[in-house]
UniProtKB/Swiss-Prot annotation:
UniProt keyword list: Acetylation, Actin-binding, Cell membrane, Cell projection, Cytoplasm, Cytoskeleton, Isopeptide bond, Membrane, Nucleus, Phosphoprotein, Ubl conjugation
Origin organism lineage: Eukaryota, Metazoa, Chordata, Craniata, Vertebrata
Name recorded for this polypeptide: Cofilin-1
Position of sequence motif Nuclear localization signal: 30-34
Post-translational modification: Inactivated by phosphorylation on Ser-3. Phosphorylated on Ser-3 in resting cells. Dephosphorylated by PDXP/chronophin; this restores its activity in promoting actin filament depolymerization. The phosphorylation of Ser-24 may prevent recognition of the nuclear localization signal. Phosphorylated via a ARRB1-RAC1-LIMK1-PAK1 cascade upon active ligand stimulation of atypical chemokine receptor ACKR2.
Compartments, as annotated in UniProt: Nucleus matrix; Cytoplasm, Cytoskeleton; Cell projection, Ruffle membrane; Cell projection, Lamellipodium membrane
Phosphothreonine found at: T25
A GO cellular component annotation in the UniProt record: neuronal cell body
Length: 166
């Protein structure tokens, strides 16, 4: 932990809940998180779950039409964040679901914030074991096009993301 920032237990619990796809009742599935944002605590000592910045599986098709577009809109204009996004995508062979770790560091974020988030990234990644895909973005142009995420998930083999053809 180069920055000395700790990862809160809440972050690890959310990650484990998103990672493990146990057989659940339809009600439990609706409560699963599709996307979450993590931020630094006020004192900059802990990485915590950002309150109210999440999409639940049950929201998709109800209050959320396109989870990826909604997720991109949750990212702040002028500050950094870490995020977990549970991507549902299709290749020519099969349907897949994978967690993607996203490091959001917009160019308009304060330099100090970018430095703390960049130096704390390894700390959070070490705690979130088993993530296959990572995306780092510095502006909305890099995330608003779902092809950027599809490229990370499997390149040209990916034919749709969140049910939307590429």
């Amino acid at each position: 932990m180069a920055s000395g920032v700790a990862v809160s237990d809440g972050v690890i619990k959310v990650f484990n809940d998103m990672k493990v796809r146990k057989s659940s009742t339809p009600e439990e599935v609706k409560k699963r998180k599709k996307a979450v944002l993590f931020c630094l605590s006020e004192d900059k000592k802990n990485i915590i779950l950002e309150e109210g910045k999440e999409i639940l599986v049950g929201d998709v098709g109800q209050t959320v039409d396109d989870p990826y577009t909604t997720f991109v809109k949750m990212l702040p204009d002028k500050d950094c964040r870490y995020a977990l996004y549970d991507a549902t995508y299709e290749t020519k062979e099969s349907k897949k679901e994978d967690l993607v770790f996203i490091f959001w560091a917009p160019e308009s974020a304060p330099l100090k914030s970018k430095m703390i988030y960049a130096s704390s990234k390894d700390a959070i990644k070490k705690k979130l074991t088993g993530i296959k895909h990572e995306l780092q973005a510095n502006c909305y142009e890099e995330v608003k096009d779902r092809c950027t995420l599809a490229e990370k998930l499997g390149g040209s083999a990916v034919i749709s993301l969140e049910g939307k053809p590429l």
